[in-house]
């Protein structure tokens, strides 16, 4: 039987994912658990207890990996060099929390793995050998990979699927090509009331999105939750190669969309990897970011979003509340002030929007695109957390501050 420590830890992780909706779920999970591991070991050292006490005791099948960090770098050597630093957390709020399937459906309680304090199944076998344990994914080899279940969807199916997965946090950050690939790899499954969709303790094979109907979650034959249209379940077992933590049964007739394990992992990993590649040159060539380590750049790349503006579009307006920091990938912008007119012009690899975030002030100027301009944006919450030492450089260059 799995310990209370393990149950509460999983529940805390579920809630954390809900609250943060991380762009890179795999990296977030790795950072979250490695940080918890580091905290646990510090406490253990203070208590003169050697080592980390695994929730699986001497039967922990992951003990070897735990000694080297709970999760290894999914991206191999990658464009940023070595392994990811297990001591960093890519999302700041890890106060305990878990997985949430967004959309019309349920909250975090409605994922089968989001079981709160429900008991772990009796047949949750930590020593079970799963066939996916040797699944090594190399994102830089994805160009040669062809999904097994790819099938072009009809217009009617596409509309249904866009509605079903459009707000699901696992997919809403995918680029258009990756999202199209996901949609065309989904398999429609219609199940009758009473059908057992997944069984606790079994090996994870599919991730499911509920289009219509309601499903129930059971642990040790005890009902713990229900979930409806727009929700999803089955993700954790695929991500971490762990047995199913619950049995899921159709409470009504249901229409489900299923994504197989390999496609699920490759699309999500591949998307994050390509995003890092895309932003690598931009971040390395920006003088203000020279102080960032390769790992810090990787975390920053994962958090960036892309926006494109056409000539004449106002990107930020003087007096507005500042919510984002901007890095120009390509293009040109005019910076103007109401009383001063044109102040300066910006070009490739310049940045703007930092003053409002550094000083918690309204926007100090208006920035307008003068031709087609592509920018990478970083939200306010990630500004201090991810820019690290680069924030000090930004402060030194802050035009609103007096320097000696």
Curated annotation (Swiss-Prot):
One Pfam family this chain carries? Answer: RIIa
Task: List compositional bias (Low complexity) regions by residue number.
Answer: 88-98
- The answer to keyword tRNA processing applying to this record is no
Highest taxon, organism lineage: Eukaryota
GO terms for cellular component:
cAMP-dependent protein kinase complex; chromatin; cytosol; nucleus; plasma membrane
- SMART domains reported for this sequence: cNMP, RIIa
Q: Which family does it belong to?
A: Belongs to the cAMP-dependent kinase regulatory chain family.
Name under which the protein is recorded = cAMP-dependent protein kinase regulatory subunit
Q: Origin organism of this chain? A: Candida glabrata (strain ATCC 2001 / BCRC 20586 / JCM 3761 / NBRC 0622 / NRRL Y-65 / CBS 138)
């Amino acid at each position: 039987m799995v310990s209370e420590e393990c149950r509460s830890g999983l529940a805390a992780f579920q809630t954390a994912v809900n609250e943060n909706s991380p762009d890179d779920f795999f990296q977030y999970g790795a950072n979250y658990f490695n940080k918890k591991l580091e905290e646990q070991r510090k406490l253990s050292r203070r208590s003169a207890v050697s080592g980390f006490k695994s929730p699986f005791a001497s039967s922990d099948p992951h003990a070897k990996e735990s000694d080297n960090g709970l999760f290894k770098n999914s991206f191999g050597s990658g464009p940023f060099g070595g392994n990811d630093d297990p001591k960093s957390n890519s999302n700041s709020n890890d106060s305990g929390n878990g997985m949430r399937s967004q959309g019309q459906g349920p909250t975090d309680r409605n994922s089968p793995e989001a079981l709160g304090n429900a008991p772990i199944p009796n047949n949750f076998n930590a020593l079970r050998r799963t066939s996916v344990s040797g699944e090594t994914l190399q994102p830089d080899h994805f160009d040669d990979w062809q999904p097994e279940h790819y099938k072009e969807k009809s217009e009617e199916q596409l509309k249904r699927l866009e509605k079903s997965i459009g707000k699901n946090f696992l997919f809403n950050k995918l680029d258009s090509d990756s999202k199209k690939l996901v949609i065309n790899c989904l398999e429609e499954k219609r199940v009758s009331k009473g059908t057992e969709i997944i069984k606790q303790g079994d090996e994870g094979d599919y991730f499911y999105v509920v289009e219509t109907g309601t499903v129930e979650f059971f642990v040790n034959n005890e009902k713990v939750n229900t979930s409806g249209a727009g929700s999803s379940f089955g993700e954790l077992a695929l991500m971490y190669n762990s047995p199913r933590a619950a049995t899921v049964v159709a409470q009504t007739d249901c229409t489900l969309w299923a994504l197989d394990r390999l496609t699920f992992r490759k699309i999500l990993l591949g998307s994050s990897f390509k995003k890092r590649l895309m932003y690598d040159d931009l971040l390395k060539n920006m003088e203000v970011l020279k102080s960032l380590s390769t790992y810090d750049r990787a975390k920053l790349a994962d958090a960036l979003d892309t926006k494109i503006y056409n000539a004449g579009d106002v990107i930020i307006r003087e007096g507005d509340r500042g919510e984002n920091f901007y890095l120009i990938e390509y293009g040109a912008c005019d910076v103007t002030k109401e009383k001063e007119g044109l102040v300066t012009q910006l070009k490739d690899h310049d940045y703007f929007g930092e003053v409002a975030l550094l000083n918690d002030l309204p926007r100090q100027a208006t920035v307008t695109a003068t031709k087609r301009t592509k920018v990478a944006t970083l939200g306010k919450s990630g500004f201090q957390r991810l820019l690290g030492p680069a924030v000090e450089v930004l402060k030194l260059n802050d035009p609103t501050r007096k320097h000696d």
